[in-house]
Amino acid sequence: PESKVLVVKLGSPSKEGFPRTTELMTGLDYVIRKALEYRMPAAVNISFGNTYGSHDGTSLLERYIDDISNIWKSCICIGTGNEASGAGHTSGRFRDDQEVVIEIAVQDSQPSLNVQIWKEYVDVVDISLVSPSGIRIGPVQEILGPQRFTAGQTEILLYYGEPSPYSTA
């Protein structure tokens, strides 16, 4: 009954998505600074997630959370999600000159689909997309930024990126 609560709004999401991770970092900074100012411990519940990124602990956000969690008397709790039964992730290894096919189930009524493919920086991989009707796009060119393709009635927007200085994947 005597607990003090600090609530931080991350910002108003744009119509394209959720608040940016930089807003999450700013919010964490604010909470820890307030905890130091009031000389009180801070327990932070982060119920903010997405399926983007390599999830290997090397992103700028992941490293920031690691660092800021060591300041003062803080406990940062992050939910791990409940998408395991949804088969939203896959991983694997393959050898040189080995072709690997990863099938993705898409419903007829599904208006869009976001797929991310992550690899180690030093690995050289050719990636192609094959539609259910057999239209093949690729191998994808290593052109940084957005690329557009059409496969039948389907428009494909592909964004090609590279690792940041904070991540090898």
Put a short name on every predicted segment.
Residues 1-169:
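Loop-rich non-cytosolic ectodomains and luminal regions
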